[in-house]
């Protein structure tokens, strides 16, 4: 066959398209992925038929599917389909704009060549009305650009025989010589139009434009070099001599009107909707997260309206305009993420994010301090000739997720994790050994060396836990000094009070965390005996509800104990119609149980209780459970930590309404910001605090590693757009690598340069104990990753958990499993549907 890579990838696209055709033929309405696959694959088949042009296929692509053949969210998700195919005259790009543009598609064309039966249109339900993913609800009111700047009007005539277009931030005095206007008045001025837009002068055009003064230090650079330097009226005669000498069109304009922006005469005003279409939503606007019912309201925008950093042809970030000139690399950002809506436990705001040396060095307003107001541009956020740009207008940025309950059963889980937005993994294991399939323990020093070395080039921060199940300290110091950043107590190794006490004593000496999976059997004692064994020492309880393991039926009581830092694993997140039914077989496989042994079956069944799973939902919403993690391949799904967190938040909003604001318990905000901040803390800052590395990762804050996830709002929580790891793009949605542009199908999450060679090591951290770092494991193991010690975990309490520090008194009825918190019964119904599911995923 001699297939090249692009052909192999198009085969995968064809398979997805044919799968979509089979689903369509049996009357199913297609989701986003299916619709894209069908349209792109069919376009390629019509290209192969050879009797249609690019223009023909651009039109035909809009005829295949209608609104009744796709799920209600799809027309809002699907704006364009692009694909490249081989015509008789070579490879060409076909772009289908607004591919879902009628109520019904032409199903004969949609199924052409498949030999599948064409279903009757009657099989498809009515279009219906649905809230669309990523919806923005705009604040009322208007935005005045370039407020308080000096302004004037000028008449401009194009004497050229070609059109001339001038961008918003181009120094107007430097404009094309064929434009005739009063250049003396234009000194130190630019167009008063939205940043990144332009005014076009056709040949012979005469227009009156409004100019505003440049901001900042008022230094002109670039253009034609006429007025290079600081704006100084005493040098104006010299500047005008250059204008005349170089033949630049100039004509006095005595009718110019002058004023100040804000007085109404010269103002350029935009409404929030128009503003958002260019730069993304701003203060007061609300964004729907994916297809959930959660709305994030932007609390603050660091932008200076009219001076936004926009990259592209004729845009702002050009030499002498938004990009500064004359600044060395040491004074400028390596990378700037522009106009991002940041969702973090610290708040929901809009800003530029500055990255240097793999770290977040500043958050606020980036740009050129020579032309942008100094109260706006942060001195740490200068954009220069050495700066790369990641345009995040209309996008959401979050901190990279942390999964702190990982069974390292296979290396491929790292690919799934980072593609979902997880950038830090904590857990244990050695591969698909039976011990690892059940417990998160990397037991021996040789295993620890293996795991640190084998994951060294992966673009993910790593931390491994040793086995803590022993009643004597012997052996524990060795694994800690070998690199363990924590210890794990697991019932499959015997989580007895004696082992708990010994493990915690060793952890206290080494300042590391202890994670525990308690005794489901109640063999050595019940939950109160295990709590007593903690002796008020800090401990992190895994899957604190109990379906993942722990004292039956009341391990959930630990969520009300001050020295316990509780977490959940994601198969029970949230409580749905099928949650209970899937768990028995999951548990039997994970813990190496035999369904022919009655006691094994009884053990498994004792862990699965609808009542406590339902209570777990509510405890999360109350902030009484602080973390959500995966339990990867051992009763957990590593690629769904983020998705299931937001599914839980959405279910709770639907069933419990808006959360009261913590500072005003009798009031609720007209948004979901408090709930959103509470839930994002569960997979970012709180696991970082619990594991002792919150100085390095866990939030979008200055000084931390630039581990960032960029999302389209319509895909938030389901599929990221880009994952930045230590300042480098490690993973991103990318189309056909042979294509003329990055967007033709098949678009998929692919590893980027930040994931290859030594880059994965350079942009990531291996977390170890202080003892291991001091012992020099980085050199001993020849690690490329930066090695950092965890710490400050002993003495943590629930009160250290951000936005998740509730301490209710929890009781469980041992017969009915009814859960109460401070005397209130915690009960909710399983949901039959969740967002972030059927609209987005092929299987």
From Swiss-Prot:
Catalytic activity as recorded in UniProt: urea + 2 H2O + H(+) = hydrogencarbonate + 2 NH4(+)
Hydrolase among the record's keywords? Answer: yes
> What is its cofactor?
Ni(2+)
Statement: the UniProt record of this protein carries the keyword Lipid metabolism: no
Q: What GO cellular-component annotations does this UniProt entry give?
A: urease complex
Q: Which residues form the Urease domain?
A: 400-843
List of catalytic residues: 591
Molecular-function GO term, any one:
urease activity
Alphabetized HAMAP family for the sequence: Urease_alpha, Urease_beta
> What is this protein's function per UniProt?
Urea hydrolase involved in nitrogen recycling from ureide, purine, and arginine catabolism.
Quaternary structure note = Homohexamer. Other oligomeric forms may exist depending on pH and presence of salts.
Q: What is this protein called?
A: Urease
Organism phylogeny: Eukaryota, Viridiplantae, Streptophyta, Embryophyta, Tracheophyta
